[in-house]
Curated annotation (Swiss-Prot):
The gene is PPH3. This is Serine/threonine-protein phosphatase 4 catalytic subunit. The lineage of its organism: Eukaryota, Fungi, Dikarya, Ascomycota, Saccharomycotina. InterPro entries: Calcineurin-like_PHP_ApaH (IPR004843), Metallo-depent_PP-like (IPR029052), PPA2-like (IPR047129), Ser/Thr-sp_prot-phosphatase (IPR006186). It catalyses: O-phospho-L-seryl-[protein] + H2O = L-seryl-[protein] + phosphate; O-phospho-L-threonyl-[protein] + H2O = L-threonyl-[protein] + phosphate. Mn(2+) 1 binds at D51, H53, D79.
């Protein structure tokens, strides 16, 4: 039996976790996540969090600002890993909290929770640097395949990492996807993780090379068809931490302050109360990113500028 509280304390301090412990954490997480649907039902009150991207110290600040997991319900909208230097610790910490408080944490898959993307944007290299092999990366990727694709809060707010898909316009259709796989390069599962809202008249190809751009018309149709009042998503850097669009029918939440340790943005989380009122909490980056755990060592592989 694993001592989750002890592992959580070690992860919060940035300490090394033995490979065997990571294997057991990931295996137990798969067993828990496989019993959740593609779209998880979540009650209020709940706090919605956007991209984390391996910024462990800022994730700890998020919990300080919004409340401990033992007393606060959270939805994380994906992109736990890549770009930041503590992707592994950030993801494992969230898995530990999920195992310790399964009804308090909902984890949604982002476009970075894939084998292909993590090989390019830092997570793979981080694991090899810390363990000398890629086993832990492989264990985590197997967990990625079991993460939910979305969540519904009180049957009124649809949460997703990226956005909408022209191939599936109802939540019930999304529930039918076979999610336990690497994210395809096209199709509804891909679109949910890759698409972006934009001031466009109709579905348009995304410059990202995956997913679509969608506008107010598509959002209004989705809200009406599914009898929900808000789409909450992440996936795009927002300098102010959050951005509402389309008469408040969609919001982007971004939770990685000073993204990539250089963008200068603030971060936000969105609390939804029992009456579905919205309350945004803004927070700034931790100044000394190497105060906890080992000093930061950048990955050797050059990383493309922000576009994923």
């Amino acid at each position: 039996m694993m001592d989750l509280d002890k592992i959580i304390a070690s992860l919060r301090d940035g300490k090394h976790i033995p490979e065997e412990t990571v294997f057991r954490l990931c295996l137990n997480s798969q067993e828990l996540l496989m019993n959740e649907g593609n779209v998880t039902q979540v009650d209020t009150p709940v706090t919605i969090c956007g991209d984390i991207h391996g910024q462990l110290h800022d994730l700890l600040t998020l919990f300080e600002k919004s409340g401990g997991v033992e007393k606060t319900r959270y939805i994380f909208l994906g992109d736990f890993v890549d770009r930041g230097f503590y992707s592994l610790e950030s993801f494992l910490l969230l898995l530990c909290y999920k195992l310790r408080y399964p009804d308090r944490i909902t984890l949604i898959r982002g476009n970075h929770e894939t084998r292909q993307i993590t090989k390019v944007y830092g997570f793979y290299d981080e694991v090899v640097r810390k363990y000398g092999n890629s086993n832990v990366w492989r264990y985590c990727c197997e967990v990625f395949d079991y993460l939910s694709l979305g969540a519904i809060i009180n049957n009124s707010i649809f949460c997703v990492h990226g956005g909408l898909s022209p191939d599936m316009t109802t939540v019930d259709e999304i529930r039918t996807i076979d999610r336990k796989q690497e994210v395809p390069h096209e199709g509804a599962m891909c679109d949910l993780l890759w698409s972006d809202p934009e001031d466009v008249d109709t579905w348009s190809l995304s410059p990202r090379g995956a997913g679509f751009l969608f506008g107010k018309r598509e959002v209004d149709q989705f809200l009406e068809k599914n009898n929900v009042e808000l789409i909450a998503r992440a996936h795009q850097l927002v300098m102010e931490g959050y951005k509402e669009m389309f008469d408040g029918g969609l919001v982007t939440v971004w939770s990685a302050p000073n993204y990539c340790y250089r963008c200068g943005n603030v971060a936000a989380v969105l609390k939804i109360d029992d009456d579905l009122n919205r309350e945004y909490t803004i927070f700034e980056a931790v100044q000394a990113q190497n105060e906890v755990g080992n000093a930061i060592i950048p990955t050797k592989k050059s990383q493309m500028d922000y576009f994923l």
